[in-house]
Structures are given as structure tokens and as C-alpha cells.
Design a protein with these regions (language model features):
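GH16 jelly-roll
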Residues: 1, 12, 35, 40-49, ...
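Short beta-strand segments within Ig-like beta-sandwich modules, predominantly Fibronectin type-III
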Residues: 22-29
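Short, solvent-exposed loop/turn segments at the edges of extracellular beta-sandwich modules
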Residues: 50-56
Length: 316
């Protein structure tokens, strides 16, 4: 990458570039720099305009190197099988067209709930080189993003769903892949039921969450249960694709990350009947809110949630 700096009264400039397994610090009298950064990932750039070594002004910003790597490198990560023994593929979107297929997806617009900051807009979702690209922007504190669902266009009861995605992980980001009961418009939440296939709350520990929500008819209160998987390197969630899956039947839901099981929850109880009905698919990137907290100076904008495919299978 090439960087040019300028500042009135500066005698020289310095830039420090840091990322996973990478660090480079250079000085320049004319403010021109060149860095050869090959690993994909997120980098922090710190630029200083010096009068003397200890008298300077400083500017920091973040670079998501995924935006400029090759197509081959961009697609790195786990890929799930196209088929499974004993299952039929009943619905899929490979995002291979020039635009989002509106026979599959609805665009939700407006402000969301959970004290989130973003305004959902259709314009923040598009197809880019065979991937769904959901963009979270934060220009001047005016946060925008996108949320898509398949309500009234596709829903299913029981089976397996695989979603291959690359998600943003900086502070305040809340990417989610989830299912909501098709009865939502008639009986509202949580009576309709909710199955969260994947949520990431922009936290530093790399926890990928799976959760279910329902209305407990025995006590009239909301029911919640779930768990999480700690990944070894949270930056890989944004630099590599992973496949987020559940296998769901009338008795239990099993969560998988890259086809490795990490969570099981039983749903056969009488008061959990809404978790055994038809559900539709939702993909979204929220910003801020009750779970991830608000963005800060380390947050990366624009942030991208890329989805390679969504595939739904049911037993023969």
C-alpha cells in the first residue's frame, strides 16, 4: 500500500502499521510511504507528523485488508458439502446474480430494537463478485446497515441450514444469522419463537453464540437458553469464511461451526411448541445495542458481512 502524508510545520513523518503477525515502522521526510502487507486481516495505522521526535500530532485509522486482496485469497475458509446423506436440498441462494433475488428476500427498513444504532436501508446490501455484501456504515455517527428476511417467500420446519459467511468483529458490530417464527406478524415475539444460528457481539474473546427464545406458557415469561463457541483467533472470523449451521428436529437443535458440533438444546417440552413450527431466515448486521455495546475509536467502518451461500436441507 502507498500512503502520502502532509502537515504544516512538520519536519518529518512516521507511520506504524500493525496487524496479526505483522508490524512495520517507517520514517519519511517527504511524507511518502510504501508498505508490503501480504496477510489478510485488519491493520491499525498510526501516522505522526513530527516537529521533533517528541513534539508531534498523531492520527490513527483502521484498514480492512480483505477489501483489496485477490478473489482467490478472499474466498479462503471452510466450505460445506453440497449434499448430505439422507437429506434433500430444498432451498438455496448462492448469490451468483447481478442483484439480490427479491423472489427470495425482503428488505427491512427503518430503525431496529435492542437499543441498536443503525437505520436499515436497502442500499446497504448488494451482490459483489458472487457474495451478498451487507455494509455497516458509521459516517459521523449516522449508522446504517441492512437486514434481509425470507418471510412469506420461504419458510421451513425442521432440517439443516448451512450459511457460509465472513463477519465483522470490531467493537459494536452485531452480525446475525437467525430464524424467526412465520407466525411473527400474528402473535409477535417471543410467542413466535426465535432460533439464533449465529450471533457475534463484537467482543474481544471470539465467542460465537447460538440461542433460542420462546414464550413459556407455564409461567407466562420469556424462555431463553443457548451457549457459545470460543474461536482461537477472532480475526479469522472476518478474514476467512466459516459455515454456521444447525440441525433441527422435533426434539432438539444442534449447532455447528465448520461442521463441528458445539451446542445442543432440547426443544421437546410442551411449553416450547413454537420452536417446532415453520421459521423464515434472517441475515443482518446490527451496530451497537444491548449485547455488543456501542462502537468506539477502534471500530472499523465500513464493516462488511459477506455471505457466500444459504442452503436448506430436509430429511428424505
Amino acid at each position: 500500500i502507498e500512503i502520502a502524508c502532509s502537515a504544516d510545520g512538520a519536519n518529518y513523518f512516521s507511520i506504524l502499521v500493525e496487524g496479526t503477525n505483522y508490524s512495520s515502522n517507517k520514517n519519511s521526510k517527504d511524507g511518502k510511504f510504501e508498505f508490503d502487507i501480504s496477510p489478510s486481516g485488519i491493520y491499525v495505522l498510526s501516522a505522526k507528523a513530527h516537529v521533533t521526535e517528541n513534539h508531534f500530532i498523531e492520527k490513527k485509522w483502521n484498514l480492512n485488508y480483505d477489501l483489496i486482496i485477490s478473489q482467490q485469497d478472499f474466498d479462503i475458509g471452510y466450505k460445506s458439502p453440497n449434499s448430505y446423506n439422507g437429506y434433500n436440498l430444498i432451498w438455496q441462494d448462492e448469490f451468483e446474480g447481478n442483484s439480490i433475488d427479491e423472489t427470495h428476500w425482503n428488505f427491512e427498513t427503518g430503525f431496529a430494537q435492542n437499543q441498536e444504532l443503525q437505520f436499515y436501508r436497502k442500499e446497504n446490501a448488494s451482490i459483489q463478485n458472487g457474495y451478498l455484501d451487507i455494509v455497516g456504515n458509521g459516517n459521523g455517527g449516522n449508522y446504517t446497515s441492512a437486514r434481509l428476511n425470507t418471510s412469506t417467500k420461504f419458510s421451513f420446519q425442521f432440517g439443516r441450514i448451512d450459511v457460509r459467511a465472513k463477519i465483522p468483529t470490531s467493537k459494536g458490530m452485531w452480525p446475525a444469522i437467525w430464524l424467526l417464527g412465520q407466525s411473527y406478524d400474528q402473535i409477535d415475539w417471543p410467542k413466535c419463537g426465535e432460533i439464533d444460528i449465529m450471533e457475534y457481539w463484537g467482543n474481544p474473546n471470539g465467542a460465537v453464540h447460538g440461542t433460542i427464545h420462546w414464550h413459556n406458557e407455564n409461567n407466562g415469561k420469556r424462555g431463553d437458553t443457548g451457549g457459545y463457541k470460543i474461536v482461537d483467533d477472532k480475526d479469522e472470523l472476518s478474514s476467512k469464511f466459516h459455515v454456521y449451521s444447525i440441525v433441527w428436529d422435533q426434539n432438539r437443535i444442534v449447532w455447528y461451526l465448520d461442521n463441528k458440533q458445539f451446542l445442543v438444546r432440547e426443544i421437546s417440552a410442551q411449553d416450547m411448541s413454537e420452536l417446532r413450527e415453520d421459521f423464515f431466515v434472517i441475515l443482518n448486521l446490527a451496530i451497537g445495542g444491548t449485547n455488543p455495546g456501542n462502537p468506539d475509536e477502534t471500530s472499523i467502518f465500513p464493516s462488511h458481512m459477506y455471505v457466500d451461500y444459504v442452503r436448506v436441507f430436509q430429511k428424505l
